[in-house]
């Protein structure tokens, strides 16, 4: 029987399912026991420094990318952008702008695939297609959803990057201020925070990002990107 971290594959997927059921109910703060299910993944950095790692999934997007970049520049902050390959092809000028501004690029598959509902062969080809575009070693699965067999394959070829704070900016029932409070309440030194670079999250991110940057930077924190060679 296939295993992951010593646990049967069915058990690992069942436990992870409990945390990511269609993203209708989601953990803002990822429990430690969940992080231990995939120990090869990066969930957060050491806790002793006043450093926060912002990450933006799904871009580039014409609605939000340029504004995010300008806002980060205003505060001299860096971030990591997990880009979708088809969006890179649609908006190459925005993708170039992310790289020119010195941020880290991560792989978020070519078509934003759900690993639970996609065959391994198709999924791996889709991830590789993005890797050919970006050269990125860091990989974040869309929705966080991977089968144990996919984890076991991908961790040999990429550095899996998850998160320990999920802002909820995609949640239409969550107010922008509640999203901000999610981050402020649950982030610790070394936290990796997920926000989204897409039209659905634009209103919330427009509210959250400048307030988030002001809060942390005025308190002496650094907003840092993930090293693109992390795990090498």
Model-identified regions with their sequence ranges:
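CE4/NodB-like, metal-dependent polysaccharide N-deacetylase domain
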Residues: 69-78, 103-104, 110-113, 120-148, ...
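Acidic-and-aromatic substrate-binding clefts and catalytic sites of carbohydrate-active enzymes
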Residues: 59-63, 82-91, 113-121, 140-146, ...
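His/Asp/Glu-enriched short active-site or ligand-binding loop at hydrolase and phosphoryl-transfer sites
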Residues: 16, 145, 151-186, 220-232
């Amino acid at each position: 029987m296939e295993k992951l971290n010593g646990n049967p594959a069915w058990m690992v997927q069942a436990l992870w399912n409990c945390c990511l059921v269609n993203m209708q109910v989601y953990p803002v703060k990822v429990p430690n026991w969940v992080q231990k299910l995939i120990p090869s993944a990066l969930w957060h950095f050491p806790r002793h420094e006043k450093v926060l790692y912002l990450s933006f999934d799904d871009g580039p997007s014409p609605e939000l990318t340029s504004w995010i970049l300008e806002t980060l520049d205003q505060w001299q902050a860096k971030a990591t952008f997990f880009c979708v390959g088809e969006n890179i092809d649609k908006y190459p000028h925005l993708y170039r702008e992310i790289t020119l501004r010195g941020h880290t690029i991560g792989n978020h598959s070519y078509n934003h695939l759900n690993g639970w509902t996609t065959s391994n062969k198709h999924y791996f080809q889709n991830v590789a297609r993005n890797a050919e575009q970006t050269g990125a070693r860091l990989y974040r699965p869309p929705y966080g959803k991977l089968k144990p067999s996919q984890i076991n394959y991908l961790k040999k070829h990429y550095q899996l990057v998850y998160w320990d704070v999920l802002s909820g900016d995609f949640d239409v029932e969550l107010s922008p201020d509640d999203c901000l409070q999610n981050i402020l309440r649950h982030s610790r030194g070394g936290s990796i925070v997920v926000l989204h670079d897409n039209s659905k999250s634009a209103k919330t991110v427009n509210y959250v990002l400048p307030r988030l940057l002001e809060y942390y930077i005025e308190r002496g924190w650094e907003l840092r990107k993930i090293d693109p060679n992390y795990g090498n």
